[in-house]
Design a protein with these regions (language model features):
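Zinc-dependent metallopeptidase catalytic helix centered on the HExxH motif
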Residues: 185-302
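Secretory-pathway/luminal and periplasmic proteins that interact with or process carbohydrate-rich
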Residues: 154-161, 277-282, 366-372
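Non-catalytic architectural context of zinc metalloproteases
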Residues: 35-224, 229, 233-234, 252, ...
Length: 400
């Protein structure tokens, strides 16, 4: 018997252990940064008059902290207007505000020519004019308005463009109007810090807009009202309303007896620029109104400081029609603008903002201001003067 070789038993291989995977580390979450809270603007502590004069403080005009409640009582007639005098501004604003919101614009064609070195600080020209147009939608308005905008560097250019524009006008028109561009600029300050709105003999509107660079304007008048006029379009609205005044009264503009006093023309334009451009905010209307009147409050200072003294006596004298012959030239500039705006507010509060253009329409039919006032406002002008003087004086005496 053959003995076979003993088979060699192959050892069972020891399995190579699988490598234990290295666990992926759980990422440490990035902490969500805590947002830095936006600091609540702090209202600067300053006097009433300093607030009106103030430039921007920490990015904001101090006047913009002011808010104004809706008055509970509004005037309805000459009989209750003094008693409810704290509601005059709101009632007047409400009248023009509603029309600017809801009425249809009658704005004609607008042509804007800007100097080669001039940058407009406000560019929504047509929308600004359109708000005024809507507010007075039933009144006559120019079918064409040409605006020439220029800074001091472009004064000669503007003068040439303007003279070409009026080249076909009669000599009588040129005598009264041809120097306008040159008259608007100050050689000593090197600025054209003014604007003019009027019509030609065909009833087409012309607006001459002096433009002051932002930084230079801040050195001339850093206040909120100056900013609003330049950069929020109030000057555009003001001058467009002047073209409406001239369009309506037409040939009678140069007949003194059938033209309103200069304070009525300018005071109504100040009211309209503010009411139309700030139609959506009574607070904004009141802020501009206060700052624009900064020279007429008692805390302003003396006349030597350029301030205006407002009293019943000065207002009664100012409102006298005996000053027609001198065109009120013996009164401070501000009396014919911001102080007169307060008189206009009273009239609008009683009879509505369209009473302003209604007066021009009536005077265009060869009626005097006294006749027009009685016809539109239902009281003789002489009877209204003491009440108007009393109301306006009370407003300034009480910082309203």
């Amino acid at each position: 018997q053959l003995i076979g070789a003993t088979p060699t038993v192959s050892p069972t291989p020891t399995p190579t252990p699988s490598a234990t995977p290295t666990p992926t580390p759980t990422p440490t979450p990035t902490p969500t940064p805590t947002p830095t809270p936006t600091p609540t603007p702090t209202r600067p502590s300053m006097s009433f008059i300093d607030m009106l004069r103030s430039p921007v403080v920490n990015g904001r005009y101090p006047i913009t902290f002011e808010t104004f409640p809706t008055p509970s009582k509004l005037p309805t007639s000459w009989e209750d207007v003094y008693e409810n005098r704290e509601g005059i501004a709101y009632k007047a604003w409400l009248s023009i505000s509603e029309a600017a919101k809801t009425s249809k614009s009658s704005l004609g064609t607008i042509k804007v020519t800007t100097g080669p070195n001039t940058t407009l600080p406000f560019t929504d020209i047509e929308p600004a004019m359109s708000l005024v147009s809507k507010a007075f939608s039933g009144a006559g308005q120019p079918s064409l308005v040409t605006m020439i905008a220029f800074n001091y560097q472009d004064q000669s250019w503007a003068d040439g463009v303007y003279r070409q524009l009026i080249a076909s006008e009669p000599d009588s028109f040129k005598r009264n109007h041809q120097e306008y561009v040159l008259d608007m600029c100050s050689a000593s300050r090197k600025v054209c810090w003014s604007a003019m709105g009027f019509t030609n003999t065909a009833g087409e509107g012309i607006i001459l807009l002096g433009v002051v660079e932002r930084e230079k304007l801040r050195t001339l008048d850093p206040s909120y009202s100056s900013y609003s006029r330049s950069e929020e379009g109030l000057t555009i609205a003001h001058e467009y309303f002047h073209t409406v005044q001239r369009k309506i009264i037409d040939k009678n503009w140069f007949r003194m007896e059938f033209t309103p006093p200069i304070w009525f023309n300018e005071g109504s334009a100040v009211f309209v620029e503010n009411g139309a451009m700030n139609f959506n905010s009574f607070d904004r209307y009141m802020r501009f109104r206060l700052v624009d009147s900064k020279l007429a409050y008692p805390s302003c200072g003396t006349t030597a400081d350029g301030c205006i003294t407002v009293s019943e006596a000065t207002m009664t004298n100012f409102l006298s029609l005996s000053h027609y012959s001198t065109n009120w030239s013996n009164f401070p500039f501000g009396m014919k603008y911001e102080v007169s705006q307060r008189v206009i507010e009273v009239l609008v509060a009683i009879k509505g903002h369209k009473s302003l253009t209604d007066l021009y329409t009536y005077m265009a039919q060869d009626h005097t201001f006294e006749q027009g006032f009685k016809h539109i406002y239902g009281i003789s002008y002489e009877s209204a003067i003491p009440l108007l003087a009393k109301i306006v004086t009370d407003q300034f005496a009480n910082n309203r």
